[in-house]
Each structure stands twice: as C-alpha cells, then as structure tokens.
C-alpha cells in the first residue's frame, strides 16, 4: 500500500520530469531555429580594390545596433527596418570593412573604400543573429557581434553561447567583439537626483523611465557615494578593474579560444 507521502512524492517527481522534458524541448527548438537562420549559401567577398579612391578617402562611418528582433521592441530594431537600412546603404554604394581594415587604416595608413562602413551589433543577443544574418549575407556585408562573456555561463537563452559564436564566425559574414566582461552601472541617480548607487542591467531596465543621465559605466570611475566621494581607494578600484579584464580574457579563451580584438564600451 502506498502512503500519502509516497504518492505525493511520486506525483511531484512526475511533474519535475515533465518540466525538464519541456525545457529540453524548448532548448532544442531554439537551437534548431538558430542554426537554420545561420544557413548561408555563399561566402563573404571582401570589397574590390577598385572601390578605393585615394582622392575620396575620408575614413569610415561606424553604425552600431543594440539588437534586432522580428517586431522591433525598444530598444531593438525590427528585422524589416534593418533590411531597409542595409538596402539604403547598399544603394548609396557603401561596402563593409573589417576590424583589420580599421587597424591597418590607423596604424599603417592603408586606404579605405570611398564609402566604407563598419557594422556592429551589441549585447550578443541570439535574436540579433537569427534576424540579421540573412540580410547581411544578401548585401555581402560583414558585421561584428559584440558580447559579454559573463553571459556564457548563464542559463539565459537570450544570449549567444560560445559554440554559437563560433558558428557565426564560420559563416564568414561575422567577426567577434566584446562590450566588456559584464554590464553594470555605478553612481546612479534618478531624474529627481535621488542616489541609487549601483545597478545591474535588469535593475537599470526596470527603472529606466525614472532615470536621468547621472550614472557611470562601472569601468569608468570610482564607486562613489551620494556626495561624489569615492567609496574605494585607488588600489581597490585598480584591483576591481584588473579582475574584470582578467575574467574577460579567461572566459573568452576558455569559450572561443581567443580574445576578440575589438572592445567597445556601451
């Protein structure tokens, strides 16, 4: 005879098993959609040397998007609007350049195409890769996907994982960059000048309608109190920053085998 406790435990275990199976099924669907979205039939072709006109070399423009989804919920851009942007750029004769092109331009004076475009997407979102790759391939553009390696270990399907980032690079239409190890805000005040201190990205997003412009990226300043007085010494700040840069390097090397050459703070 089964006791009430045993029956309850068995019922609870069955529910847990169903939940695990459902979660695994969702992950499989997400992975399938992602890899189908990355299916490309061509390879990126660098711009032709004839695109370079020494007399018209005026550097390049950099265009960065926070992210892309199907409908364009703020702060993301929609798939259709991105298609309009890229089509307009292509019509005006813009060709994309790579991170190496930029480095050679500044360090060796290598000329760039008359209409050179550096294209980047921030935050390392999975939906960005899904909804933008086909458009990038369509116009033979090359883009950089910037990520936060702190997200590699999180069980959050919103962000790209190392294996997926490698798949992006394999398409030849993507390069990798970084926005830093993580995103965090310090010395935050709301628009009424109330001191809030330090905020995570989630906390920041939840109260963003009530925030002004008084805040700092956590790598850009001392952590300060409401009077602007540092709450840490120079040595403490340096140790905090050193730890962050070391974690960035370690996680990228472990996840994708190397550290991206492009670093952009949001």
Residue ranges of predicted features:
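C-terminal domain-boundary segment and adjacent tail
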Residues: 2-3, 79-111, 240, 250-260
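Short, solvent-exposed loop/turn elements at domain surfaces
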Residues: 69-75, 129
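Membrane-embedded segments
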Residues: 105, 114, 120, 124-134
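N-terminal Lys/Arg-rich, disordered targeting/topogenic segments
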Residues: 1-19
């Amino acid at each position: 005879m089964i006791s009430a406790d045993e029956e309850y435990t068995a019922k609870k275990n069955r529910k847990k098993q169903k939940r695990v199976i459902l979660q695994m099924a969702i992950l499989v669907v997400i992975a399938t959609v992602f890899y189908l979205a990355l299916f490309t039939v061509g390879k990126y072709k660098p711009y032709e040397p004839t695109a370079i006109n020494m007399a018209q070399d005026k550097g390049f423009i950099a265009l960065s998007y926070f992210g892309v989804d199907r409908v364009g919920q703020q702060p993301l851009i929609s798939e259709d609007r991105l298609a309009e942007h890229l089509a307009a750029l292509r019509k005006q004769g813009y060709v994309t350049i790579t991170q190496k092109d930029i480095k050679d331009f500044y360090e060796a004076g290598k000329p760039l195409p008359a209409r050179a475009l550096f294209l980047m997407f921030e935050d390392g979102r999975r939906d960005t890769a899904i909804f933008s790759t086909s458009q990038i391939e369509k116009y033979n553009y090359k883009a950089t996907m910037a990520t936060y390696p702190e997200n590699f270990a999180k069980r959050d399907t919103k962000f790209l994982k190392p294996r997926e980032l490698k798949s992006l690079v394999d398409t030849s239409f993507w390069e990798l960059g970084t926005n830093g190890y993580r995103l965090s805000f310090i010395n935050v005040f709301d628009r009424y000048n109330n001191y809030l201190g330090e905020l995570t990205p989630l906390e920041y997003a939840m109260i963003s309608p009530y925030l002004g412009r008084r805040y700092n990226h956590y790598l850009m300043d001392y952590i300060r109190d409401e009077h602007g007085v540092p709450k840490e010494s120079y040595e403490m700040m340096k140790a905090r920053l050193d730890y962050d840069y070391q974690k960035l390097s370690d996680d990228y090397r472990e996840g994708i085998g190397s550290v991206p050459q492009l670093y952009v703070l949001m």
